[in-house]
Amino acid sequence: MVDINQIPTRRPFHRRRKTCPFSGANAPKIDYKDVKLLQRYISERGKIVPSRITAVSQKKQRELAKAIKRARFLGLLPYVVK
């Protein structure tokens, strides 16, 4: 009979924690006029992509959302994409 304690166990898989793309020395600044940068954080339907997907820190996600909303209000970005 096989002893359970003698079966080799696998090490658990550790996913590397993503770092915030807006943190660091030469990171881009979040600006409502930088439409190209803001479009990377908007889904194809026009919704703001959550930080758990984009790996943006909580503070920078709030800044990003504010910049996207400001750009929408000024007509630089669409509210909804059909």
Curated annotation (Swiss-Prot):
Q: Quick one: a GO biological-process term for this protein?
A: translation
UniProt-listed Pfam families: Ribosomal_S18
Cellular component, GO, one term? cytosolic small ribosomal subunit
GO molecular function term, any single one = structural constituent of ribosome
UniProt-listed InterPro entries: Ribosomal_bS18, Ribosomal_bS18_CS, Ribosomal_bS18_sf
Q: Where is this region: Disordered?
A: 1-20
Q: Which UniProt keywords apply?
A: Ribonucleoprotein, Ribosomal protein, RNA-binding, rRNA-binding
KW Transferase (keyword) present: no
Q: How does it assemble?
A: Part of the 30S ribosomal subunit. Forms a tight heterodimer with protein bS6.
HAMAP family named in the record: Ribosomal_bS18
UniProt record similarity statement: Belongs to the bacterial ribosomal protein bS18 family.
Q: What does this protein do?
A: Binds as a heterodimer with protein bS6 to the central domain of the 16S rRNA, where it helps stabilize the platform of the 30S subunit.
Output this protein's name. Small ribosomal subunit protein bS18
User: What is the organism field in this record?
Assistant: Brucella canis (strain ATCC 23365 / NCTC 10854 / RM-666)
